[in-house]
From Swiss-Prot:
Gene name of the record: LOXL2
Protein name (Swiss-Prot/TrEMBL): Lysyl oxidase homolog 2
The UniProt record lists the keyword Isomerase: no
Disulfide cross-links: C84-C148, C97-C158, C128-C138, C218-C291, C231-C301, C265-C275, C351-C414, C364-C424, C395-C405, C464-C530, C477-C543, C511-C521, C573-C625, C579-C695, C657-C673, C663-C685, C732-C746
Activity control note: Specifically inhibited by a mouse monoclonal antibody AB0023, inhibition occurs in a non-competitive manner.
Cofactor comment: Contains 1 lysine tyrosylquinone.
Residues of the SRCR domain: 58-159, 188-302, 326-425, 435-544
Residue span of region Lysyl-oxidase like: 548-751
Location of this chain's protein in the cell: Secreted, Extracellular space, Extracellular matrix, Basement membrane; Nucleus; Chromosome; Endoplasmic reticulum
Organism for this UniProt entry: Pongo abelii (Sumatran orangutan)
Signal peptide: 1-25
Length: 774
């Protein structure tokens, strides 16, 4: 860039779910690799604990943000207690997680990060190798021998993946009151032909997996609250009644395999691992008593609007939030993002103090999704802008909206580094199976191949790379569960895909960016046309779990705007780079001048990765006037519009150099324009285009006095992927009297409600991209 010289019973045992092929269509974990990359899980052989080791039970409790994490609690000698963090290690965490049925531990936490427990501290100075069958087999000071307090209670974060074939040890079930449910996996199995043909599956038997066997749950103690929890896990906001007579008739024809326990949920749980194990069920086949003469439990779930069958296309082709009070921003997937709430006409964020699964589930259900998979903290889904409306939210789980929960309106001590987010359970649509990447160096990149029907058969083929861009790539990465797109490729000759998939089967793809799948984008259908050919010009993508997010400082634009009448003889460099209006060519070069609307722009990267230019160094352009390279031809548009949305003047900045001008806190600068330096904007840093550098203006010499709208758009052509494009527009009202100009009500697009926007006198966006004749 050009620069001037200068409660313990309700706590849960974490569980679920490495999915078997049968249940994969019912419940999608996050994140996940495409099926073609997944390897079959090895058969699990649960180690046996030595005979002289005490029998214990474990659970994960406390203020959890995922069902697979929490404070470690141990049931021993008739009492639940905790574990001290002294000498605790990742090896001990592995033992805890595997004893609970998870593949491994991701990390562990000290100093009661999930809240202080109650009861005895059973284990202190715990030493494990990581191979023990039970935590009781690790060495320690002895049971209850400790000098710790509950401020030192240890917690663990387990992998979401379950051990295949894992079977929970229920040997202490008769000794422990209100034991949490432990199953390897759970699914909704469609029984009636009507529902077997539907996607997603919304009704059927509730089945749990024990070892390698799927079993039904007896409905003798089944309640609507249980159904609500199950529906929430599978991505549905609520449950409904069903035709019991049909299922009774169906059950009488088949022999059932029942799980020997019942469930006891309150209806507010985000996951069944938070529900209690209900009474045992009599299953004595010798006495002709099966499920106490009951039937298999059935659930019928209500899909949210996004996933409801709707018209001939069956599903809405693009997702647009319609909830007026809550929205999600910055997520890679539908049902994921930073939580923003509308208050007094302005959108603001939520502080993550006390943010948990219960509160996150209220948000998810409010937006038409299921319960929450994760309550995201620490602005891990990007930082928001504007006010922080809510803090210390505490929901019971029964609320219809997050604004019905108890909360603190004071946000002292909070900043946007603590913005809360959610990852919601969404219905499994099976869309991932209709797309794959081939030939890449890793599962996050490759040639795009789609599964289509041709002449009654399903065939894999390529997508034409003509006019393929980052927006289309974003849809592909989302559909595959691989996050955001980092690059879109129109040529993939260097990636050798499946030779049986070398035929182009999809062309003319044009996406808005919000579609659930590539098939929902506009395309040519069966009339495929790819003039450049197939194998060489097949579309490709590279995906990434994170993305940048650029936001302009609207206040700075408003504060730094002014007019300058600049002589033509001082604008020679600007003339060479076409930074002036067309009429400048007729202006006398010695006595003439141009009236320039000047301002400073400060562009922040609030995302989770660095913003890098689309082109590599080999494609950068040297600008002799400025003595450095420009890496992006189009990075920002500056436009002056009349009140009906027609452009009357525009900035003509030819190209841009990107660098870190300043950074937050102790973040290091990584990019600079000088000395052919690497270019970009580091996350947590900003690039400053000062008002006094060349071409940082709009030439308004030919604009008459009047009321106007000033608009700045960052990354207008979507050349670089971002986690949120909705905040790339800044709008201001302006008044020009022929001598002075005023800027007011400058703000980022989407910061206010539609009603408030109307009060500002703004329109939805640029209506005509051509300059109107003067």
């Amino acid at each position: 860039m050009e620069r001037p010289l200068c409660s313990h019973l309700c706590s849960c045992l974490a569980v679920l779910a490495l999915l078997s092929p049968l249940s994969l269509a019912q419940y999608d974990s996050w994140p996940h690799y495409p099926e073609y990359f997944q390897q079959p899980a090895p058969e699990y052989h649960q180690p046996q604990a030595p005979a002289n080791v005490a029998k214990i039970q474990l659970r994960l409790a406390g203020q959890k943000r995922k069902h697979s994490e929490g404070r470690v609690e141990v049931y021993y000698d008739g009492q639940w207690g905790t574990v001290c963090d002294d000498d605790f290690s990742i090896h001990a965490a592995h033992v805890v997680c595997r004893e609970l049925g998870y593949v491994e531990a991701k990390s562990w936490t000290a100093s009661s990060s999930y809240g202080k427990g109650e009861g005895p501290i059973w284990l202190d100075n715990l030493h494990c190798t990581g191979n023990e069958a039970t935590l009781a087999a690790c060495t320690s000071n002895g049971w209850g021998v400790t000098d710790c307090k509950h401020t030192e209670d240890v917690g663990v974060v387990c992998s979401d993946k379950r051990i295949p074939g894992f079977k929970f040890d229920n040997s202490l079930i008769n000794q422990i009151e209100n034991l949490n449910i432990q199953v390897e996996d759970i699914r909704i199995r469609a029984i009636l032909s009507t529902y077997r043909k539907r996607t997603p599956v919304t009704e059927g038997y509730v089945e749990v997996k024990e070892g390698k066997t799927w079993k039904q749950i007896c409905d003798k103690h089944w309640t609507a609250k249980n159904s609500r929890v199950i529906c929430g896990m599978f991505g549905f906001p609520g449950e409904r009644t069903y035709n019991a007579k049909v299922y009774k008739m169906f059950a009488s024809r088949r022999k059932q395999r029942y799980w020997p326990f019942s469930m006891d949920c309150t209806g507010t749980e985000a996951h069944i691992s938070s529900c209690k194990l209900g009474p045992q069920v009599s299953l004595d086949p010798m006495k002709n008593v099966t499920c106490e003469n009951g039937l298999p439990a059935v659930v019928s779930c209500v899909p949210g609007q996004v996933f409801s069958p709707d018209g001939p296309s069956r599903f809405r082709k693009a997702y647009k939030p319609e909830q007026p009070l809550v929205r999600l921003r910055g997520g890679a997937y539908i049902g994921e993002g930073r939580v923003e709430v509308l208050k007094n006409g302005e959108w603001g964020t939520v502080c993550d103090d006390k943010w948990d699964l219960v509160s996150a589930s209220v948000v998810c259900r409010e937006l038409g999704f299921g319960s929450a998979k994760e309550a995201v903290t620490g602005s891990r889904l990007g930082q928001g802008i504007g006010p922080i409306h809510l803090n210390e939210i505490q929901c019971t789980g029964n609320e219809k909206s997050i604004i019905d929960c108890k909360f603190n309106t004071e946000s002292q001590g909070c900043n946007h580094e603590e913005d809360a987010g959610v990852r919601c359970n969404t219905p499994a649509m099976g869309l991932q199976k209709k797309l794959r990447l081939n030939g890449g160096r890793n599962p996050y990149e490759g040639r795009v191949e789609v599964l289509v029907e041709r002449n009654g058969s399903l065939v894999w083929g390529m997508v034409c790379g003509q006019n393929w861009g980052i927006v289309e790539a974003m849809v592909v990465c989302r559909q595959l569960g691989l996050g955001f797109a980092s690059n879109a490729f129109q040529e993939t000759w260097y990636w050798h895909g499946d030779v049986n998939s070398n035929k182009v089967v999809m062309s003319g793809v044009k996406c808005s960016g919000t579609e659930l799948s590539l098939a929902h984008c506009r395309h040519d259908g069966e009339d495929v046309a790819c003039p450049q050919g197939g194998v060489q010009y097949g579309a490709g993508v590279a995906c990434s779990e994170t993305a940048p997010d650029l936001v302009l400082n609207a206040e700075m634009v408003q504060q730094t705007t002014y007019l300058e009448d600049r002589p033509m003889f001082m604008l020679q460099c600007a003339m060479e780079e076409n930074c002036l209006s067309a009429s400048a060519a007729q202006t006398n070069p010695t006595t003439g001048y141009r009236r320039l609307l000047r301002f400073s722009s400060q562009i922040h990267n609030n995302g989770q990765s660095d913003f890098r230019p689309k082109n590599g160094r080999h494609a950068w352009i040297w600008h002799d006037c400025h003595r450095h390279y420009h890496s992006m031809e189009v990075f920002t548009h500056y436009d002056l519009l009349n009140l009906n949305g027609t452009k009357v003047a525009e900035g003509h900045k030819a190209s841009f150099c990107l660098e870190d001008t300043e950074c937050e806190g102790d973040i290091q600068k990584n990019y600079e324009c000088a000395n052919f330096g690497d270019q970009g904007i580091t996350m947590g840093c900003w690039d400053m285009y000062r008002h006094d550098i060349d071409c940082q203006w709009v030439d308004i010499t030919d604009v008459p006095p009047g009321d106007y709208l000033f608009q700045v758009v960052i990354n207008p052509n979507f050349e670089v992927a971002e986690s949120d494009y909705s905040n790339n527009i800044m709008k201001c009202r302006s008044r020009y009297d022929g001598h002075r100009i005023w800027m007011y009500n400058c703000h980022i697009g989407g910061s206010f409600s539609e009603e408030t926007e109307k009060k500002f006198g703004h329109f939805s966006g640029l209506l005509n991209n051509q300059l109107s004749p003067q």
